[in-house]
A protein has these predicted regions:
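PLP-dependent amino-acid enzyme catalytic core
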Residues: 1-240
Length: 240
């Protein structure tokens, strides 16, 4: 991730656009004590009946609807349509406010689906988003990412990005995937020179199937921004 000192002044125009186009439309706490505590609250769905029916049919339990009420959060209905909208908004707002993310930069991130869908919102700000995905990603998710304008890089790796999945693969295979990655980035309009200059490190990360740190590395060499969702404390703090 870029150091804050590189960009001491935030991009005020981008921050203003973020607040109007994104923050105002997603669930967030209201700072005005005279207004509702939560703005754009996540819709709740009453799941009591199906849960009680499941308890009766599957477990032989008879539970009265008078003694329990079960509600589910319907995250697909909020702006951004993903359970990861809140952490994505927090992380990107912090990045813009501290000068780490500015107009013209590209967001790079490894995703198994939900966080990538949330990042699609930021296309409204004119920011490019490149998601590193694996071929195991559900077809519907891939189509939605494309619909949202997220640029996809298929690493052709049989894992979903997740912490700790650093499995060694054949060096020849890693080199082949690296070349495929290089071609895909070129097709997305990125200069191949930064890739070529750091190819050894890219191949090392691919050999370990370390998609998370690969996203961080690409953001660094291309002067972009990586939310680092798996290591970012805001990803946890937003749910507290």
């Amino acid at each position: 991730m870029q150091e804050p000192s590189q960009f001491p002044e935030p991009d005020r125009d981008l921050l203003r656009k973020f607040h109007g186009e994104i923050k105002a439309k997603v669930p967030h706490l209201n700072q005005d004590a005279s207004a509702p505590a939560v703005v754009n609250a996540t819709p709740l769905v009453d799941l009591t009946r199906p849960f009680l029916e499941c308890a009766r049919v599957e477990y032989g339990l008879e539970v009265s609807s008078k003694s329990v009420k079960i509600l589910g959060k319907f995250d697909s209905q909020i702006f951004g349509g993903s359970v990861k909208v809140r952490p994505a908004v927090q992380i990107v707002e912090n990045a813009i406010s501290t000068g780490k993310l500015r107009t013209g930069q590209t967001i790079f991130e490894a995703t198994s689906g939900n966080f990538g869908l949330a990042l699609g919102m930021f296309r409204r700000l004119g920011l490019d988003v490149i998601a590193l995905v694996s071929r195991k990603l559900q077809e519907g998710v891939l189509e939605q990412l494309k619909k949202d304008g997220v640029k996809l890089v298929d690493l052709d790796i049989d894992i979903c990005p997740a912490p700790g999945l650093n499995l060694d693969m054949n060096t020849v295979v890693a080199k082949s995937i690296a070349e495929n990655l290089r071609q895909q980035l070129g097709q997305l309009g990125l200069d191949k020179s930064p890739f070529d200059s750091s190819r050894a490190e890219i191949e090392r990360l691919l050999a370990r199937q370390d998609v998370i740190n690969l996203a961080k590395h690409l953001a660094k060499v291309y002067g972009g921004f990586c939310p680092e969702q798996y290591d970012n404390e805001l990803n946890v703090a937003v749910h507290e």
